């Protein structure tokens, strides 16, 4: 605290002062403890206890320093006592209390604060240097006066003592401050300045009321005893920490003097302000991070989608597709309706293959635009994903039958891509994938539903055209494809050639779907024509995508395994036949 800092200054000040006074001060310091008690008893019985507690605190800090402080305080107190004769002992006693918190520089102010001193024991010790400077510099006492007049408002003699001590102290303190006093006060000034600054900001309104309360609390020994205890602790603080502690404790101790709470409220207010500022910053950061997380997951998942068939894909895509569903539906209803009525296998390949590029586009689009909605739908989609596929179909797709059939066709095409490459082992792999992808199946099935809808899949267009039409179209595709079922053996051979071409044609359809205008019947023919050129470019991407779809749909068609394979083989031939024939 400022105590140790002020104590050496006091010693130097005492040396600067007449030695007779220092002797008297020392004598009063030695006798000061009992004398202070008596003075307090004379003026304020309540302050007597304060004086005792302060003495105990002073003794706890360091008897020599306390004696020196008391000597200085007594000298100042005596000087104050000379001018404020009746109240001088009170000033001394209060000074002593103040001295317990090194008040030597603030003698004048402390005299005024002595009333507050009982309450503001720690405050006086911390502010002692701050007020000390005012008392030392004539003009500052005036400044200190108004600052502490609020504390002195109770009208105790300390106000007069402060004025007299301010008048006296300029004479007494100049020699005292002549040495290190001038330097140390500057530090207290800084501390007191910051303290007053923050207090004026936060405690101006509190200070007058607190000063009145302090006057009352000075009358209450319990509260005063608590304050001296704080002051004693502040006295115990090392000199190195005096200034910093003075700043912190002045804020806290003044609060404790005010009620040991008001200061804390100030500290709490500061802490609250800081916490609020931090909370605002954190909120901003959290908001930014929230958007970042919303944006980055979508983007990251768009990257992951071609690689991972995990559930991450489903939530974002489902949310994105939901947000962008309206955009796709209106356009895709036109193109998809035509596609579903055109070459069904190629149309199915469109609906199957297009979803992922469209998903990526929708992710990028809806990611930034529909971040909060994406998050909400993301969570909802996850929840819906946990729902059985049938329920998902009911929820997401108005006609689950349409989706099932269309997905059977889709799965057939997808399995065609891999079956063409994998030939026979696909059934077993599909079963294993079904079992493994059970958790993912619902998610992927949900994605399929959303992708079929959002990307203008046959199901969505057929839903618009009518549930019956969807059932008919899907059934017609399956039935029309069924005749070549006896050709499964030749399918792998053609499939290998046709798979790449199917994928290529699917890629073509993806591009045309993105254009959303070329997805018409003539577009399908042109797609098959341009399959060869695009096959090299889009073949690889499509190879990965059908694998994902297989896994996702594999779990979805657990009960449809044999049917799924039949559809795959059945669709393989017609789908592959077109491009294969052209390639031939």
Swiss-Prot record:
Compartment(s) of residence: Cytoplasm
Residue numbers carrying Phosphoserine: 124, 192, 314, 381, 399, 552
Domain of life: Eukaryota
Record bears the keyword Cytoplasm: yes
Alphabetical keyword list: Cytoplasm, Phosphoprotein
Stated role: Required for myelination.
Record's protein name: Breast carcinoma-amplified sequence 1
Organism: Homo sapiens
Lineage, uppermost ranks: Eukaryota, Metazoa, Chordata, Craniata, Vertebrata
Gene: BCAS1
